[in-house]
Amino acid sequence: MTLIALILPAYLLGSISFGVLASRFFQLPDPRTYGSGNPGATNVLRSGKKSAAIFTLLGDGGKGWLAVALAEYSAPLLELGNEAVAAAALGVFLGHLFPVFLHFKGGKGVATALGILLGFNPWMGLLAATIWLAVALMWRFSSLAAIVAASLAPFYALFFLGFEARTLVVFIMSLLLIWRHKSNIAGLIAGSESRIGKRSTS
């Protein structure tokens, strides 16, 4: 029951889509209706409104960090350890991917995963962000940057965290994140994948 008390609020927090909220605030089309149909920062950027994309990025990343921070504060009070923090992290990530408020059709989890990594260990999060940024700047594909960063994440989780529950969650998140990019992988292979900053024509 104590774990559920951490997981459920984390899942509900993860279910908040900042891409949809930002689009409503800036009076933009729903991001689920154009581009990739994904309510994440990269697709919101295709609206041409950079401020909305930044809001989405900070919101989606912030909820991942917040879930971890709250769990780290609450776990000792509930006489729980890192397994509780790991459970909350997985809860907020699954909430983003399968949000109850959007009929379980959410984003791909890149920003939320980054927020979680920053919460687990700031250096680990910064390393992930640096890898993403380097790949994105070199090839201009957000999806490729996410896939590369996700593929490497379990290795630097082992380095910074060792063998423990949070490392297992990083591994699970990496698999889910890559799986959520399966259509992007097909696009990269076919040469039809959209580059960062390309505005939607739909």
Swiss-Prot record:
Gene Ontology terms, MF aspect: acyl-phosphate glycerol-3-phosphate acyltransferase activity
BP-aspect Gene Ontology terms: phospholipid biosynthetic process
Bilayer topology annotation: Multi-pass membrane protein
Pathway: Lipid metabolism; phospholipid metabolism
Catalyzed reactions per annotation: an acyl phosphate + sn-glycerol 3-phosphate = a 1-acyl-sn-glycero-3-phosphate + phosphate
Subcellular location field: Cell inner membrane
Superkingdom per UniProt: Bacteria
Functional note: Catalyzes the transfer of an acyl group from acyl-phosphate (acyl-PO(4)) to glycerol-3-phosphate (G3P) to form lysophosphatidic acid (LPA). This enzyme utilizes acyl-phosphate as fatty acyl donor, but not acyl-CoA or acyl-ACP.
Assembly mode: Probably interacts with PlsX.
Name this polypeptide is given: Glycerol-3-phosphate acyltransferase
Organism, scientific name: Nitrosospira multiformis (strain ATCC 25196 / NCIMB 11849 / C 71)
Gene: plsY
